[in-house]
């Protein structure tokens, strides 16, 4: 899915003159900070589409030839800096015409509304007038009004680029069924003490390990049919957590993607490769988790538990919980544990997963970590 940044032209990309017509080369001047901001957004995966009202373009008062020269030069300047526009959409009507193709109308947007490859949740509109914001509202996307002396507004280009490209990776998932009501809220870019309440104290303690050792803010609230047994509550919590991870990561641009032993791990065999996953000891127990946010859910578990349950958590539901996370998040997880104490073994599994997640979700740049073009 590709996000689109729709941009106005006059007053947004280039400074608008007093007569509102850029019909001569000497009138052409770029808006401050527009190029570095758009380069940042390009690197974050955005494509750009110009949507502009040009009153009476092609009439005697505004000949097409007077428009084309400065406009082509503007496009060449942007292209020379690595900024290409997917399309330039111009409405040439007068305001009195009330044409559906004139902003804030969205008549020019029909092909885009039919394009299922567009990430509308991340798409946005930037302009200097209230009609640009109304255009964004009609498209049901976010609108940014650039700050100008004439039309007001609150944003500059640097702030817009930061808001869109560096947006916090958050998710709020509410999963309601006849058996459970699960609420998961997380913020992958904020550290906070985890908060969990599922009605199963030992399970709460394990969920806290994911947020604490994963290095992100995590809140989980669950109400389930515990009068029947624990299965639905634990399973649906895993599904909701997996969905929240998937939503917060978005297109996964810039993340580490993989979680495994770092080169500096004291638990790796000398000269070994990180194929055994993130290895974590807990007294006599050792667990390892290797994971990949590939978009292809797959779960492999190697380990045994001697006890039927630890606290109020059935041990048979430990691997089932991790499988549920994988199914909902598109995660490939290999989890291995060995030891004597089942409490230690369960807790080590959760901590190993958390530390592997910490690596995989870490931002390392802006590139998409795949050669396929999508994850």
Swiss-Prot record:
<feature type="active site" description="Nucleophile">
    <location>
        <position position="8"/>
    </location>
</feature>
<dbReference type="InterPro" id="IPR006543">
    <property type="entry name" value="Histidinol-phos"/>
</dbReference>
<dbReference type="InterPro" id="IPR036412">
    <property type="entry name" value="HAD-like_sf"/>
</dbReference>
<feature type="region of interest" description="Histidinol-phosphatase">
    <location>
        <begin position="1"/>
        <end position="168"/>
    </location>
</feature>
<dbReference type="GO" id="GO:0000105">
    <property type="term" value="P:L-histidine biosynthetic process"/>
</dbReference>
<comment type="pathway">
    <text>Amino-acid biosynthesis; L-histidine biosynthesis; L-histidine from 5-phospho-alpha-D-ribose 1-diphosphate: step 6/9.</text>
</comment>
<dbReference type="InterPro" id="IPR020566">
    <property type="entry name" value="His_synth_bifunc_HisB"/>
</dbReference>
<feature type="binding site">
    <location>
        <position position="10"/>
    </location>
    <ligand>
        <name>Mg(2+)</name>
    </ligand>
</feature>
<keyword id="KW-0368">Histidine biosynthesis</keyword>
<comment type="similarity">
    <text>In the N-terminal section; belongs to the histidinol-phosphatase family.</text>
</comment>
<dbReference type="GO" id="GO:0004401">
    <property type="term" value="F:histidinol-phosphatase activity"/>
</dbReference>
<protein>
    <recommendedName>
        <fullName>Histidine biosynthesis bifunctional protein HisB</fullName>
        <ecNumber>3.1.3.15</ecNumber>
        <ecNumber>4.2.1.19</ecNumber>
    </recommendedName>
</protein>
<keyword id="KW-0028">Amino-acid biosynthesis</keyword>
<feature type="binding site">
    <location>
        <position position="128"/>
    </location>
    <ligand>
        <name>Mg(2+)</name>
    </ligand>
</feature>
<keyword id="KW-0456">Lyase</keyword>
<dbReference type="InterPro" id="IPR020565">
    <property type="entry name" value="ImidazoleglycerP_deHydtase_CS"/>
</dbReference>
<dbReference type="Pfam" id="PF13242">
    <property type="entry name" value="Hydrolase_like"/>
</dbReference>
<dbReference type="InterPro" id="IPR023214">
    <property type="entry name" value="HAD_sf"/>
</dbReference>
<dbReference type="InterPro" id="IPR005954">
    <property type="entry name" value="HisB_N"/>
</dbReference>
<feature type="active site" description="Proton donor">
    <location>
        <position position="10"/>
    </location>
</feature>
<dbReference type="GO" id="GO:0004424">
    <property type="term" value="F:imidazoleglycerol-phosphate dehydratase activity"/>
</dbReference>
<dbReference type="GO" id="GO:0046872">
    <property type="term" value="F:metal ion binding"/>
</dbReference>
<dbReference type="InterPro" id="IPR020568">
    <property type="entry name" value="Ribosomal_Su5_D2-typ_SF"/>
</dbReference>
<comment type="pathway">
    <text>Amino-acid biosynthesis; L-histidine biosynthesis; L-histidine from 5-phospho-alpha-D-ribose 1-diphosphate: step 8/9.</text>
</comment>
<dbReference type="InterPro" id="IPR000807">
    <property type="entry name" value="ImidazoleglycerolP_deHydtase"/>
</dbReference>
<comment type="similarity">
    <text>In the C-terminal section; belongs to the imidazoleglycerol-phosphate dehydratase family.</text>
</comment>
<keyword id="KW-0479">Metal-binding</keyword>
<feature type="region of interest" description="Imidazoleglycerol-phosphate dehydratase">
    <location>
        <begin position="169"/>
        <end position="375"/>
    </location>
</feature>
<keyword id="KW-0963">Cytoplasm</keyword>
<dbReference type="InterPro" id="IPR006549">
    <property type="entry name" value="HAD-SF_hydro_IIIA"/>
</dbReference>
<dbReference type="InterPro" id="IPR038494">
    <property type="entry name" value="IGPD_sf"/>
</dbReference>
<keyword id="KW-0378">Hydrolase</keyword>
<keyword id="KW-0460">Magnesium</keyword>
<dbReference type="GO" id="GO:0005737">
    <property type="term" value="C:cytoplasm"/>
</dbReference>
<keyword id="KW-0511">Multifunctional enzyme</keyword>
<dbReference type="Pfam" id="PF00475">
    <property type="entry name" value="IGPD"/>
</dbReference>
<feature type="binding site">
    <location>
        <position position="8"/>
    </location>
    <ligand>
        <name>Mg(2+)</name>
    </ligand>
</feature>
